[in-house]
Amino acid sequence: MLAVAIVACLLALTVFGGGTDTDAAELSKEDMKKSDLSTGCCVHDPQVLYDSASDKYYMYGTHMTGAAGDNLTDFQMVYDGVRPSNKMFSNLFDIPEGEKLPAAFSFVGKNDQRGYSVWAPSIIYDETMGKYLMYFCTTSSFIKSSLCLATADSAAGPYTFEKILLSSGFSRSTVDKTDFYEVCGSDAKLSDYVRNGSFINTLWPNCIDPAPFYDRDGRMWMTYGSWSGGIFLLELDPATGDVIHPDADPDNGVDKYYGYRLVGGGHHAIEGPYITYDPDTDYYYLFVSYGNLQANGGYQIREFRSKDVTGPYVDEKGEAPNLENGDDFNKYGCKVMGNYSFPSQETAYKAPGGQSVFTGRDGNLYIVYHQRFDNGTEDHEPRVHRLYETEDGWLVAAPFEVTGEGDTADSLMTDIKPAGTWYLVKHRLDVTKKVRQAKKTTFNTKGTFEGDYSGSFTVKDNSPYITVELDGVTYQGVLAKGTDEAGNSVIYFTAVGNDNESLWGVHYVSE
């Protein structure tokens, strides 16, 4: 496969470089290889960490799942299942003397199945502590959750549960089981958080889906939240891993207990936040999942960005969903991807989400997420795609799973003129179970295309940047080459429009 990939890249450079016509080397639909890719592991809400100390990749996810690999295409399961015999944690299920529940579940208790729920871990290396910090959540209902901290001496674990950091879903009768009054003071106004005896979940967050990261100055932060009151942000103390509670500033969306309000609220379907800082663009990028996570739930990945870590985070239109406009939340956020199918895929992809972003061994940015399929099941697998920076500073995803790193990774192409048959997928803003099938179009060297879609395009000289005009929308993106999941050589572009929709185009290349 490595030799084939290298030959394909050399062919692409020969046929497509220098602004030449691209249809001479195209692969017909009938001759395409087709496949159903299987990664061999099952991790929901995956986070990937490249650990330079061991030169390995570690992937952790919901239900105490974990995998490890020497590269991005071959992960092996290491941990699986919420049970004491799973050695991801050394002490998570230990019950303190005199107590009835393990400490991590002291507030949330057991779930409806009378078991324990452990969701969405995310790991960061803390240089101050010299420890790997795992932030994760325990939960028992759609609002009753605790954000927790565990530590380890290696990325592989085992992790030692340290403490509960934050809780949601409390009532007047249960708030004393949390640190709310310890943080906010004995005279804190509980009625701002509890109404008619119940937690105001449309206003305040569900304490799940934590994601730690470093800002441009090396300070540690954690974003978190799911549905409920939206996505929030708190700074972290590098000496302890604990949260730093800010001074309250209600006029600017800052709460003493829960921190900085970023996007969402009103119990709308926005969850799984992840923030990454890109020094090349000097932007912070906030990725979230919209919709319901089931195969037919319309799950999808959206993107916002900000010049400041605490926001405001906005989309291509300079907007974001909030407590006032949340009923139309699907209009906001650049859509990274949703349900789609290309002709080389035997089964359509559905409900991508639960994403995180990381820098690989090769220095490239990648996005990892769980992927469901149009096969009548709720089976899912992790997928890793390359991320690129557009000329105007948005991050866009490659259409296919990675097939290599470094010299064998997908790479940008400069000074080409797309021509021949291209398959276009337009990721629309609706939250739906509908699959966006690739539309066949013909590109010509005069800068136009026609077929199922008709429009125009320009490629900036001596650069990978492409601009596509389609249905009154301007898409800005990049051109790249690589290999699809079936092993076909491809030229593709990935772009985001000024209407927040994204556009993928794929040209299949004969070898």
State where each predicted segment sits.
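Sec-dependent signal peptide cleavage junction
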Residues: 11-27
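Sec-dependent N-terminal signal peptides
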Residues: 1-9
